[in-house]
């Protein structure tokens, strides 16, 4: 693990997505400081979450909140979301819930959320799935212990 500033990490991810022409915006970001994490692993988790967001929706929004205890990184989209009863299932390896979302936008093998959840656990955290209050689709929140 390295000492990383979450603002810098998100700036790098935003630059990469914008170079790729993807509709990803930066939402609310709060808290300052650095924390120990594996930047390549966290970037991979966020790339997976952004990829899912853009597969099922047309836009995504990234945000973070850093506190004394945790870093919360959220990826929200405007897609159909995942029904609450199926969210736990969606975190399992090879889970494909395309019929719950949009069968025309599948194509993954069902590992993106599972990998992100594993990366969260390796940082003493968790991946939470919910509904985006603003965009209406899925909100995937990577919570990493500080």
Label each PLM-derived region with a short phrase.
Residues 59-69:
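Short beta-strand/loop element within the Bergerat-fold HATPase_c
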Residues 49, 112, 116:
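Short alpha-helical Gxxx[C/S/T] motif in the catalytic ATP-binding
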Residues 77:
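Acidic ATP/Mg2+-coordinating residue in the GHKL
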């Amino acid at each position: 693990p390295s000492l990383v500033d979450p603002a810098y990490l998100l700036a790098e991810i935003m630059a990469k997505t914008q170079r790729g022409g993807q509709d990803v915006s930066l939402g609310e970001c709060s808290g300052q400081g650095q924390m120990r994490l594996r930047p390549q692993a966290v970037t991979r988790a966020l790339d997976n979450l952004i990829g899912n967001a853009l597969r099922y929706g047309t836009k995504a929004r990234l945000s973070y909140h850093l506190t004394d205890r945790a870093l919360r990184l959220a990826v929200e989209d405007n897609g159909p979301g995942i029904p609450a009863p199926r969210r736990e299932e969606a975190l399992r390896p090879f889970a494909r819930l395309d019929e719950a979302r949009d069968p025309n936008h599948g194509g993954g093998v069902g590992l993106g959320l599972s990998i992100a959840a594993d990366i969260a656990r390796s940082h003493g955290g968790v991946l939470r799935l919910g509904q985006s209050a603003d965009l209406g689709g899925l909100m995937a929140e990577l919570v990493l212990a500080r």
